[in-house]
């Protein structure tokens, strides 16, 4: 939820579909998105929130740090804040999928998921613009 609005008009399976429509570089990223779409996460949680939440919090701070200065140029404050939250939530959700499929998770898994997200989404102006457009439609 950002600025009193929500991105939950789409389920995680629907967000996975949206991400699958974007340009992709690595087949392993496609695999992750398909796993997100198909994996039941009932009962799955981070094993030790005291360990994981600070790292994930810093990930959100990073996305806000990267997106909000861009909003000064394009005026998309709400959309860019929502993009930062969606990016954080997507990586967190993919981490939960990893736990569901592999039974455990280590910091290197988070780093790899974040690296893939950055390469596939964050550093593709076209993908970011498409996601900003899709976000604006649900805000």
Model-derived regions, located:
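Hydrophobic, aromatic-lined core segments that form the binding pocket/scaffold
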Residues: 1-139
